[in-house]
């Protein structure tokens, strides 16, 4: 998955936004964010097909895990999207504050799922407010944070292959009966006047 973080984030956000009415209205294309879906230039000769299969497995596992996460904490996410008060000037600050709180005391796969869910929520809120020019910027913030902050931990803990092993093939849905498998608590707090998402996950 080296060099494919942007592809993964773009496809994840695009898939999520395709379910959102506010975003679909901006384009008749089934893909609501065609300007984000640029072909990757990171593939080595002969690796495209294999890498594509791996990326699809990661994307599917990530979609299932975030869907389960958002379903589990539906009320919290509803409150979050209605109270974020996102503007062109405050979006990046809100993103940075939430990330600082989310990973303040460490990283685990559950918090990485929460990271993607929050990025999606931020994109949906921006689309709802017709600030679609924010979408590629949010994607870039996610890519930067993923590559520069989260990847060292991920590489030390088995990489995306380990994530697929934990959350792939509908494992997230099967974990509904086990609180330890998908986390302990989602809380929402005020941070310097900005409504932020804080998720404390128990290590698997």
Curated annotation (Swiss-Prot):
Transmembrane segments: 181-198
Keyword tags: Apoptosis, Membrane, Transmembrane, Transmembrane helix
Subcellular localization: Membrane
Domain of life: Eukaryota
Span(s) of short sequence motif BH1: 101-120
Family of this protein: Belongs to the Bcl-2 family.
Family annotation (NCBIfam families): bcl-2 (TIGR00865)
Role of this protein: Confers strong protection against cell death.
Protein name: Apoptosis regulator R11
Organism, as annotated: Xenopus laevis (African clawed frog)
